[in-house]
């Protein structure tokens, strides 16, 4: 199953794969670039949340915490958690359609399968999706990884116990 951002760059990238595979993609608004604009320390205007100077974000321990990264004044003012919850909620709805239901920090494999799910999206939102699936702060992904345009990230589910699935990333970018 193929899903694509409504934005041009991702649609253009998807078009080549879709044409070769003779497939179509469902457009999902939540796959657009992650939108919140935060006023970074020492700045006067909003900027994307995934492009900070290292000393600015690394000085705040909360940014490393999967449960509290969004609780800083900067992110609260930018409504980052609300956007994060919307995006990850939509991801969970999509995964439910494919047989995986979020249960705390893992997924229940209610209809285990070998579906391949392909998402054509953008770096900022990719890191949001990965942070949710891997249970880590997106700040570490936004600032510790780099995915060039048209890069491919691969995840799979691991079901070591019947009905319990977790996601593993086998390649990034």
Residue ranges and their predicted role:
Residues 11, 123, 149:
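Conserved glycosyltransferase catalytic-site signature
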Residues 1-69:
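Phosphate-coordination/substrate-recognition cap region in phosphate-metabolizing enzymes
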Residues 3, 114-121, 125:
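Beta-strand elements within well-structured catalytic alpha/beta cores of enzymes
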Residues 16-20, 94, 132:
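Alpha-helical structural signal in soluble globular domains
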Residues 13, 86, 90-94, 125, ...:
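Amphipathic alpha-helical segments that form well-ordered structural scaffolds
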Residues 54-62, 80-93, 157-173:
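A short, terminal or domain-edge coil/loop segment
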Residues 34-52, 101, 105-116, 127-173:
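Acidic, low-complexity terminal tails and accessory targeting/binding regions
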Residues 72-106:
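Internal catalytic-core helix/loop-beta-alpha segment
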């Amino acid at each position: 199953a193929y899903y694509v951002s409504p934005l041009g760059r991702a649609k253009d990238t998807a078009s080549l794969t879709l044409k070769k595979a003779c497939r179509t993609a469902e457009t999902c608004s939540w796959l657009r670039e992650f939108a919140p604009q935060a006023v970074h320390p020492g700045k006067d205007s909003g900027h994307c949340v995934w492009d900070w100077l290292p000393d600015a974000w690394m000085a705040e321990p909360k940014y490393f915490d999967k449960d509290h990264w969004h609780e800083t004044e900067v992110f609260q003012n930018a409504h980052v958690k609300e956007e994060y919850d919307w995006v990850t909620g939509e991801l969970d709805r999509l995964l439910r359609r494919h047989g995986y239901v979020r249960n705390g920090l893992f997924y229940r494999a209610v209809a285990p399968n070998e579906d391949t799910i392909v998402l054509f999206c953008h770096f900022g939102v990719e890191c949001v999706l990965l942070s949710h699936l891997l249970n880590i702060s997106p700040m570490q992904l936004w600032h510790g990884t780099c995915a060039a345009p048209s890069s491919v990230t691969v995840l799979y589910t691991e079901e070591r116990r019947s009905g319990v699935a977790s996601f593993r990333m086998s390649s990034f970018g």
